[in-house]
Amino acid sequence: MKILVDENMPFVEPLFGDLGEIIPVNGRTLTVAQVRDADVLLVRSVTKVNAELLSDNHQLKFVGSATIGTDHVDLAYLGERNIPFSNAPGCNATAVGEFAFIAMLELAQRFDSPLKGKVVGIVGAGNTGTATAKCLQAYGIKVLLNDPIKEKQGDPRSFVSLETIMAQADIISLHVPITRTGEHKTKHLLDEARLTALKPNTWLVNCCRGDVIDNKALVRVKRQRDDLRLVLDVWEGEPTPMPELVPLAEFATPHIAGYSLEGKARGTFMLYQKLCQLLNIAADKSLLDLLPSFNIKAVELATAPDEKALLQLARFVYDLRDDDNMFRNIFLNENGFDTMRKNHRHRREFSALALAYDRQLEVDWLSNLGFSGVGQ
């Protein structure tokens, strides 16, 4: 069995090596000829899977995407051809939630404006939005949720309108899929009018899709409103972001919010489980066996951390400033965006870091944030 796999997908060999011949490929430049004789195709969001790509393949047994979203896959076409498909919903939700939370802590430190006491509006209450809310609520932050689709579906959580979030939230964090048509279209959800209407000193964090914000309008508005603070992990026109927008962001990264080692391992592992199910064979590999031990064994706390100390703990796991600095130095280079994504060092999640502190009740919130070993 020939398994064609994106070269940037981790842990493929230990998971799929027993199932067939693994052929790594560049997902962004994948051709019809390369796919022609594949039995299994494993992709990421950079690969458009459609009739054009699969036109010469008549033996494909499974398409898997190690991603939350599916907008890069023509699901109707796969359905017509009876080709099984699976993605990995929620695989990197924890990573995105922690990234957004860390970014807010970094902004708080940089501008001497504590995160504690602010109101955060989360637009999109799916896997990543929920993970972001979990971090914030663990830290005691008031969260407003906006998700008209989930609200209509009867989700029991309390929701507010986007206009309410714009009026009341100090921070807005975006976590919606890209939808280009319909009642709940998200393309340019934040257009020039809404960007202009943001309350003074709003922090805007985008970890979902670049097209959710009108990037040209964002440049115009930001140039007139220096009070707005931007954290941008996604961009219109990826992998070529607007060169004039990057310098206007307080933190800028190349679509890597979900790039934790745990998240990427989960994505590949979920596809492994699905393929084993389709082939009717036992999935006998373990996710835990894939992950290396963290380079810091444990951190002993003398007191419950304040916000400054919490940021330091977060930086032990992931220092956003490093990726921000690297991206600014590389994004104008040819293939700089993709090169940084490909060579990303796969940060760890909070769960990789064990904390030791005697007074459990004072630090339960650290356990809720995701740190391990607290109070043990």
Curated annotation (Swiss-Prot):
Substrate binds at residues 45, 67, 259. It is an enzyme of class 1 (oxidoreductase). One of its GO terms (cellular component) is cytoplasm. NAD(+) binds at residues 147, 233, 258. The keyword Transmembrane does not apply. It is found in: Cytoplasm. GO terms for biological process: pyridoxine biosynthetic process. Keywords: Cytoplasm, NAD, Oxidoreductase, Pyridoxine biosynthesis. Its EC number is 1.1.1.290. The active site is at residues 209, 238, 255. It catalyses: 4-phospho-D-erythronate + NAD(+) = (R)-3-hydroxy-2-oxo-4-phosphooxybutanoate + NADH + H(+). InterPro entries: D-iso_2-hydroxyacid_DH_PdxB, D-isomer_2_OHA_DH_cat_dom, D-isomer_DH_CS, D-isomer_DH_NAD-bd, Erythronate-4-P_DHase, Erythronate-4-P_DHase_dimer, NAD(P)-bd_dom_sf, PdxB_dimer_sf. GO terms for molecular function: 4-phosphoerythronate dehydrogenase activity; NAD binding; protein dimerization activity. The keyword Oxidoreductase applies. Catalyzes the oxidation of erythronate-4-phosphate to 3-hydroxy-2-oxo-4-phosphonooxybutanoate. Belongs to the D-isomer specific 2-hydroxyacid dehydrogenase family. PdxB subfamily. Homodimer. This is Erythronate-4-phosphate dehydrogenase. It comes from Shewanella sp. (strain W3-18-1). The lineage of its organism: Bacteria, Pseudomonadati, Pseudomonadota, Gammaproteobacteria, Alteromonadales.
